[in-house]
């Protein structure tokens, strides 16, 4: 499941594009997630009231959370699969405090791929999408293993 160095470079090149506007990309990812998978919105008490795309776009809290999500993910991706230290506290909080099912992380990964492709179509072609899919699947698989260690089977 590992990525080649070339694949990691494609992932990191996409991550650099995201870093130029973490909050904007993050907000777009969360809106895509919530619109495509409305059940995920129920896990976010502070966003449950946001029912329309216009209300989501106007939410500074949603933008801040998107920034937090993509900052954490960017830090993990930069580790090129050697993300044990970063993953452990994230898995702990998502399993025990937030109780986020793994399937929601897969839905978030789909939203990330969609947003990157829509915002950067020239730079995020099939090869970059494939590499990012592999990197996000590695992340999801590793966090699922941590969930299992914690006794969370969500």
Swiss-Prot record:
- An example of a Gene Ontology BP annotation on this entry? removal of superoxide radicals
Binding of nitrite, residues: 65
The similarity comment for this entry is:
Belongs to the globin family.
Q: Which SUPFAM superfamilies match?
A: Globin-like (SSF46458)
MF-aspect GO terms: heme binding; metal ion binding; nitrite reductase activity; oxygen binding; oxygen carrier activity; peroxidase activity
Q: Name one GO cellular component term.
A: extracellular exosome
Provide the function of this protein. Monomeric heme protein which primary function is to store oxygen and facilitate its diffusion within muscle tissues. Reversibly binds oxygen through a pentacoordinated heme iron and enables its timely and efficient release as needed during periods of heightened demand. Depending on the oxidative conditions of tissues and cells, and in addition to its ability to bind oxygen, it also has a nitrite reductase activity whereby it regulates the production of bioactive nitric oxide.
Subcellular location per UniProt equals: Cytoplasm, Sarcoplasm
Describe its assembly.
Answer: Monomer.
* Modified sites of kind Phosphoserine: 4
Binding positions for O2? Answer: 65
InterPro entries recorded for this chain? Globin (IPR000971), Globin-like_sf (IPR009050), Myoglobin (IPR002335)
Q: Write down the PROSITE patterns for this protein, in alphabetical order.
A: GLOBIN (PS01033)
Under Enzyme Commission nomenclature, its number is 1.7.-.-, 1.11.1.-
Phosphothreonine found at: 68
| Keywords on record | Cytoplasm, Heme, Iron, Metal-binding, Muscle protein, Oxidoreductase, Oxygen transport, Phosphoprotein, Transport
**The reaction(s) this protein catalyses:** Fe(III)-heme b-[protein] + nitric oxide + H2O = Fe(II)-heme b-[protein] + nitrite + 2 H(+); H2O2 + AH2 = A + 2 H2O
What is the protein named? Myoglobin
Record's superkingdom?
A: Eukaryota
Ranges for the Globin domain?
2-148
Residues bound to heme b are: 94
């Amino acid at each position: 499941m590992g990525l080649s160095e070339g694949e990691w470079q494609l992932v990191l090149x996409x991550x650099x594009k995201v870093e130029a506007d973490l909050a904007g990309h993050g907000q777009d990812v969360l809106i895509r997630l919530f619109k495509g998978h409305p059940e995920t919105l129920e896990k976010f008490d502070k966003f449950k009231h946001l029912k329309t795309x216009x209300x989501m776009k106007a939410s500074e809290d949603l933008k801040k959370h998107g920034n937090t999500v993509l900052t954490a993910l960017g830090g993990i991706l930069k580790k090129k699969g050697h993300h044990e230290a970063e993953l452990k506290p994230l898995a702990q909080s998502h399993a025990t405090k937030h109780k986020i099912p793994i399937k929601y992380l897969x839905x978030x990964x789909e939203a990330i791929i969609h947003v990157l492709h829509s915002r950067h179509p020239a730079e995020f072609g099939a090869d970059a999408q494939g590499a990012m899919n592999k990197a996000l699947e590695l992340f999801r698989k590793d966090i699922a293993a941590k969930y299992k260690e914690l006794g969370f089977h969500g």
